């Protein structure tokens, strides 16, 4: 939030400005086992929606990219904190779905300048999940529950 507002002056004075937020598919579809992470990404989605309307009067386009699981250091984490193990490490994710290369995110950032959509899910899985979450949310909740059933807290 602070970064977006801090950059507003610069964006207002730059022709064809684009403010791009990095969200996550976890902000569009349920992510059991990482509820707080999903909630923060859902907040980024809400911020993006609101800023898109607010900044439109300055001719600043606001959008976001929504990566699927991406091969970054976050998947290497075995611990979320000193006393909590990460339920979503690379091995866990690899057993359930495809992990996208980081280059896919870099390309999406580059392409976002000409892409006019507000939400930009990446990869086949991300686009599939996002599409069906809008079309049939109960299906995605069912699939998410089955796919990640062993991440629920006991």
Give the label of every model feature segment.
Residues 27-29:
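Conserved catalytic-site region of short-chain dehydrogenase/reductase
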Residues 31-35:
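Active-site loop immediately N-terminal to the catalytic Tyr-X3-Lys motif
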Residues 37, 45:
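Catalytic tyrosine of NAD(P)H-dependent dehydrogenase/reductases that use a Tyr as the general acid/base
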Residues 9, 53-56:
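Alpha-helical segment proximal to the catalytic Tyr-Lys
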């Amino acid at each position: 939030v602070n970064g977006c507002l801090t950059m507003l002056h610069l964006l207002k004075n730059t022709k064809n400005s684009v403010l791009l937020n990095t969200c996550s598919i976890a902000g569009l579809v349920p992510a059991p086992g990482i509820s707080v992470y999903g909630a923060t990404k859902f907040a980024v989605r809400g911020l993006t929606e609101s800023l898109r309307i607010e900044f439109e009067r300055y001719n600043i386009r606001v959008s976001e990219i929504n990566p699927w699981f991406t091969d970054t250091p976050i998947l290497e984490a075995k611990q979320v904190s000193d006393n909590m193990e990460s339920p979503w490490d690379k091995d866990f994710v690899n057993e359930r779905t495809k992990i996208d290369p980081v280059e896919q995110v870099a390309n999406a950032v580059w392409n976002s300048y000409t892409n006019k959509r507000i939400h930009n899910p990446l990869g086949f899985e991300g686009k599939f999940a996002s599409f069906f979450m809008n079309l049939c949310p109960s299906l995605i909740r069912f699939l998410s529950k089955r796919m990640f059933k062993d991440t629920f807290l006991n």
